[in-house]
């Protein structure tokens, strides 16, 4: 689940209230490359009796593919993780500034100030630009804005500094967390996964709104055949901007074994 700390629509406390209203009993906040929403979310979860799982979603790159690593039950005071996040946030902002300039130079009435106003947190990203494009009537959805204007091959695209997935695993483990490969069906090369497992990956997000039924079956079989010890996880990837977000919120499956481990995990 994402909040205004990165590219979500709702503040951490609002996301918790939405979750409670849906009868959700456990909630993981995994904002992109930031920890800034965790304290507020944890306090609100305590009020509503929800089990809170502090997390993060780290943006990484491998063979020109964007790979995301989820970290669950992380220690948000980790020095190494916070130092890396500061570097990532600075690089992220410089990239967004360049993208906004390209769009403005093409004649689109967009400014960095307007984009910044869409982010209430420390993390600013492409969805904030896409939201402005949507409000200007240039695109109909956030996904369309990212796909048609802000992705590789598009006029306003700017590559960004990223960690490697192996560096992300190290950072998550140094923060006493559980590293999980996020939505591999979107862009993760299959040949990379065994290398990540050998390096210390502990789970795969099998259930995700953008995974097809065939992909879900494939990853379930992959885990059963090659790495039975891997956690099978799932997430709504809730951002709050599209109608489908609300249908998916709380609807993704998480095996009971995995949920118990995520809830109770303590580093050995």
State the predicted function of each range.
Residues 44-194, 253-265:
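Extended substrate/RNA-proximal surfaces in nucleic-acid metabolism proteins
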Residues 268:
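Acidic, metal/ion-coordinating pockets
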Residues 1-65, 149-155, 167-176, 180-182, ...:
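An N-terminally biased module of ancient metal coordination in phosphate/nucleic-acid-related enzymes
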